[in-house]
Amino acid sequence: MLAFPGRMKKNRHILILSAAMTARPLHLTTYNIHKGFSQFNRRLMVHDLRQQLRALNPDLLFLQEVQGLHQHHANRHGDWPELPQHEFLAEDHWHASYGANMAYEHGHHGNAILSRHPILASHNQDVTHLQFERRGLLHTQVQPAGWAQPLHCVCAHLSLFGTSRRRQMQALIDKLEEVAPPGTPLIIAGDFNDWRNAADRVLVRQLGLTEAFEVFGQQPRRSFPARLPLFRLDRIYVRDLKIEHAEVHWGGSWARISDHAALSAWITPANGAP
């Protein structure tokens, strides 16, 4: 299991991190991008995806089903990006870290974290239970400008099968108890495939996490399919952070880009000061 930290090109839009910038909430988004294709793989949408993410302009992106390499698609599609998708999407807007989970003869795919702020460290944890369904947890440390502590960020894409998900969540808990003890600001976001809401019962109890929408007296929001969400598959969990606002991006142009809706949350330090 490999994690590939990337570098962000400097430009005039990101060189200056002012006090006013650090005072505003950090905007984070989680999104299963379906390897850059629309639902049912009908159209290559990675260029539209990049425009949509630039317009949304989050500080942190937790992406699942990111295509690191696919020689067949590159040969078939004339507009297939030359760069791996995490680098193509990040370009000069975000730092990028990628963890390859599933490798095959013609390529690989996995999870990625894109950050406007520096990525200090990155590790991809293999949590595969079933060999035909390889999974990983991408863990990075991100240092927002002006914050006293780095954020521990985990991008998750869990199994379709309940037994495997339970094993993967326990592996996540064991790892975070070791590297991110209580008092450490923590974000876990991604595609949990958790339509039964079992993750809440486990992660909230054992890691002290808060689900982004439950802060406002709601259940985790429906996020699949993107055209008319029916299932609660995707999540944003935080610890030692305050959720200021949360929303779902679905329908319209979002429904044309991927089969999942995107989730966003705006966070500040729990004590109100960086």
Model-assigned labels for residue ranges:
Residues S38-R43, H70-E82:
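Short, flexible/disordered intra-domain loops and linkers
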Residues E65-V66, G190:
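Short acidic donor-binding/metal-coordinating loop in glycosyltransferase active sites
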Residues K9-L60, D92-Y98, A103-P274:
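Active-site regions of metal-assisted phosphoester/phosphodiester hydrolases
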Residues P81-A96:
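Charged, glycine-enriched surface loops/patches
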Residues Q67-L69, W195:
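Short "lid" loop at the C-terminus of a central beta-strand within the Rossmann-like core
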Residues M1-K10:
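Extreme N-terminal basic, low-complexity initiation segments
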